């Protein structure tokens, strides 16, 4: 117990000594700092020229500091403007390249269609050329359409009512007389048409024969019958 009490007392004494030493060192530091500050604030008598030079130097330093502070912003703005100006030419160049590519594609398409049109033109030239004449523009065959009149049917249609007339039925007789008048008018018109076509049968025949000799092209391989069908009017 005595040993333990002795050690505690020693520890307390050492701690007090350390605390006193630290406080003395701190006091000395504070005193030295106060002395340094007093030396700083001591006014040294100088002339007017030295005061002006120091003030001018301070002003120049302030100006330089302000300029140095502004310079990075100017550099940044100039760099940003240069980057923007570099971007615009690249976009223009890309647009020009796209337009050139588009024009090349259009030229290729035009050349392709020109070749197709030229091939179609050659095919049209190789096809047989058939010359159309005013006589066969609306007909597939070269023979004109001429009506044929059978006079047998007309005469029989006149004879049948005469045989079947009843003297007792007056109404039927009146109706048949009216029909016969219409038939007579119809027969007269048909006779006129036959007479008209009889005049033009021979010249038409010669024209058709001449057309079949000259219409076909020698390059064509298709063959047509040169014989012509001539209408015939039968009278009995």
From Swiss-Prot:
<keyword id="KW-0732">Signal</keyword>
<dbReference type="Pfam" id="PF00363">
    <property type="entry name" value="Casein"/>
</dbReference>
<feature type="modified residue" description="Phosphoserine">
    <location>
        <position position="28"/>
    </location>
</feature>
<dbReference type="GO" id="GO:0042803">
    <property type="term" value="F:protein homodimerization activity"/>
</dbReference>
<dbReference type="InterPro" id="IPR031305">
    <property type="entry name" value="Casein_CS"/>
</dbReference>
<feature type="modified residue" description="Phosphoserine">
    <location>
        <position position="25"/>
    </location>
</feature>
<dbReference type="GO" id="GO:0035375">
    <property type="term" value="F:zymogen binding"/>
</dbReference>
<keyword id="KW-0597">Phosphoprotein</keyword>
<keyword id="KW-0494">Milk protein</keyword>
<feature type="modified residue" description="Phosphoserine">
    <location>
        <position position="47"/>
    </location>
</feature>
<dbReference type="GO" id="GO:0005615">
    <property type="term" value="C:extracellular space"/>
</dbReference>
<dbReference type="InterPro" id="IPR011175">
    <property type="entry name" value="Alpha-s2_casein"/>
</dbReference>
<dbReference type="InterPro" id="IPR001588">
    <property type="entry name" value="Casein"/>
</dbReference>
<feature type="modified residue" description="Phosphoserine">
    <location>
        <position position="169"/>
    </location>
</feature>
<feature type="modified residue" description="Phosphoserine">
    <location>
        <position position="157"/>
    </location>
</feature>
<feature type="modified residue" description="Phosphoserine">
    <location>
        <position position="24"/>
    </location>
</feature>
<feature type="modified residue" description="Phosphoserine">
    <location>
        <position position="82"/>
    </location>
</feature>
<feature type="compositionally biased region" description="Basic and acidic residues">
    <location>
        <begin position="84"/>
        <end position="93"/>
    </location>
</feature>
<keyword id="KW-0964">Secreted</keyword>
<feature type="modified residue" description="Phosphoserine">
    <location>
        <position position="85"/>
    </location>
</feature>
<comment type="similarity">
    <text>Belongs to the alpha-casein family.</text>
</comment>
<feature type="modified residue" description="Phosphoserine">
    <location>
        <position position="23"/>
    </location>
</feature>
<feature type="region of interest" description="Disordered">
    <location>
        <begin position="72"/>
        <end position="93"/>
    </location>
</feature>
<protein>
    <recommendedName>
        <fullName>Alpha-S2-casein</fullName>
    </recommendedName>
</protein>
<feature type="modified residue" description="Phosphoserine">
    <location>
        <position position="81"/>
    </location>
</feature>
<feature type="signal peptide">
    <location>
        <begin position="1"/>
        <end position="15"/>
    </location>
</feature>
<feature type="modified residue" description="Phosphoserine">
    <location>
        <position position="80"/>
    </location>
</feature>
<comment type="function">
    <text>Important role in the capacity of milk to transport calcium phosphate.</text>
</comment>
């Amino acid at each position: 117990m005595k040993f333990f009490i002795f050690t505690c007392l020693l520890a307390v004494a050492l701690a007090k000594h350390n605390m006193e030493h630290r406080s003395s060192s701190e006091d000395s530091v504070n005193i030295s700092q106060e002395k340094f500050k007093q030396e700083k604030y001591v006014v040294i008598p100088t002339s007017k020229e030295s005061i002006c030079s120091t003030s001018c130097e301070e002003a120049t330093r302030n100006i330089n500091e302000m300029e140095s502070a502004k310079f990075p912003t100017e550099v940044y703005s100039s760099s940003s403007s240069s980057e923007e100006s570099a971007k615009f030419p690249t976009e223009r160049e890309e647009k020009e390249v796209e337009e050139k590519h588009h024009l090349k594609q259009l030229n290729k398409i035009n050349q392709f269609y020109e070749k197709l049109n030229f091939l179609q033109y050659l095919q049209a030239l190789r096809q047989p050329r058939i010359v159309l004449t005013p006589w066969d523009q609306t007909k597939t065959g070269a023979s004109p359409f001429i009506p044929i009149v059978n006079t047998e049917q007309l005469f029989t249609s006149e004879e049948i009512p005469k045989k079947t007339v009843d003297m007792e039925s007056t109404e039927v007789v009146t109706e048949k007389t009216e029909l016969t008048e219409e038939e007579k008018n119809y027969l007269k018109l048909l006779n006129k048409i036959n007479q008209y076509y009889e005049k033009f049968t021979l010249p038409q025949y010669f024209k058709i024969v001449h057309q079949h000799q000259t219409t076909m092209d020698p390059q064509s391989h298709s063959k047509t019958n040169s014989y012509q069908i001539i209408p015939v009017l039968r009278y009995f």
